């Protein structure tokens, strides 16, 4: 099998089979799988992702489209730097070596990539364009630097975006994230928050889950900003933001963030307050707030109510208010908010009902809208009416106004690491921040760098960071931070349109190819990569690099590949190949020690539940692997890898070869000539009959005695139609099931004593075409042996004949007074009168008629006959 696969991979390479032109009379189709990080080896998660994309690309090519299906490398990142530290080498060497190996692996899987368009994000000829783009953003005030409280990963020694903090830990290292103030570069993604939100509804071909995640991440809130005066210090106020200002008369406290400016100005930091602030500093993002137990500490401050100076409210430092959302302060309404209620109960704060309800709000908050009560001038109004009214009052008193807030924050792009794209800025004592001139781009990374595992090597480099200021020519310092690696992946899909363009994009090529018709990748990128790419596309549109404002028309998120985990008696993880199953128990191959099978989980290096791709390829071949990862589960669901599954796929491929040999024999018997030439369906039927089962001898029936297996012929056309529909809807496992059914039907016909050779041969020819996008190597081989002169990858997808889908017979349910009494198979041509006459005389029906004449006979065509009798 490996020889056949290598043969066709070489043919595709020599014929430039999957290279496409930017100019074609055909309609375009751009299918793209998320580019991989070159970690060293392709894993089965990659294989599943890329197999899905390859089926779509090959299918759309057969459908007559000009298909762009490229591949490249998201090549910057921490693993390369960590490997450099470990191996005392340069990250570039490690990265390029990995790319070479992984590219070889991808080619060995037969993926139909246009390799001439390959991109590598760590290539200066790639990242020089994004450096220029960053400078353009800076000129438009869409990029800026400020001191900010950041998420600091103490293991990777770098800043993390909120999205990269998972349950309080770094998404790569797993280290507990700390809070630090650092100067950081930001992009103003918030300037596009409204458009990013509004356009979600137009992404009709995106999964609802992803659209919902983006909506929640952008998090638009309409409410009000207004001020509370500090009691006994009325010149000082606390500004709060609230999405429910109408509940102001139910206020029980003011909640502020642990780093709110008023704490430094007015609060005496007792040990209790200091300890609480330190604890709050470890909460990194609003996702964690929802999970944390609600806690607070009293500051000693009070504020007065804006509409009733007799009401004073305590100011509480809480662990669920963040400084980077709204104003960093809220008023708590415990009767009508779950978080506020939890804190109020814990701290014995006032809980006052202001929305009519029968619920005891002292025990449970009522969080729905309703009619206002206990609310002075708002009494009797609905929640919406009261919201408008109270905002009007704020504006009259000049203490507040209507405000829109977003959960989305500006994108922090600074990373204190070496292996990333240098930020093209210079810091001059005399001139301040100075952009690197366009003519000096790219700013490249130094080759002579040492890694000791501490901090940023660029900041410690003896010469690289020293440069003269472009404005005053005095000594200055380069920016030593590098871009977040999501910067590179936020525009790479535009570069594939012409990877040799002298500018960031070839706009003419982008106008032809964009948007991407189908983008394929994991749902874990819903609120990072996918949101950033949408943002970049909008800015690139304004910079005239592209004409579209949304990058991806369609999105498909595939499930993960899972495998059982194993541990020895000492709680050490084991690789699957180290384990053998005996009966219902597991043992270590080498020592025969007992092994514990754990949960079935996502394949990962840490738990060693990995399957080596190269080992599988040598044993089963690329086609069998492709078939298994596509056939065992719907592509959007998780897939469990198990040996019996891949073995079954290997047997199916072997069966195809055996079927070919059998059909070749039948054809030769029928025609007494070589099996070659035109494979189109012959108009003349011919039938072979087995003369002697023991010898295999056969004879051909005369034409007038031949028969056509109409059911098999119908199944061929049915399969063509529904496989095409299944592929279009990404129901790839269902498409494979249909093709297996057709293969079984053909195989069954071959084994009969009386064989419709023409339909068998035609059906097999069709089957090979249908299977090609899934298992391209073996199908190309069989296609050639079938006598076809044209390459299968160049062939059209088979057409079906609608008239052939009709059955000669159909089964109807026969009822008496609405109750099922029998069924009957009718010929398609049967008239209504014939149907009525036959059903009335059926023995089972006669039994219930008991000699009576039917009062009425109701027919539901091709489904039910209902005989009504008194």
From Swiss-Prot:
ATP binds at residue 605. Its main location: cytoplasm. It is found in: Cytoplasm. GO terms for molecular function: aminoacyl-tRNA deacylase activity; ATP binding; leucine-tRNA ligase activity. Its EC number is 6.1.1.4. One of its GO terms (biological process) is leucyl-tRNA aminoacylation. Pfam families: Anticodon_1, tRNA-synt_1, tRNA-synt_1_2, tRNA-synt_1g. A motif ('HIGH' region) lies at residues 36-46. It is an enzyme of class 6 (ligase). This is Leucine--tRNA ligase. It comes from Rickettsia akari (strain Hartford). The lineage of its organism: Bacteria, Pseudomonadati, Pseudomonadota, Alphaproteobacteria, Rickettsiales.
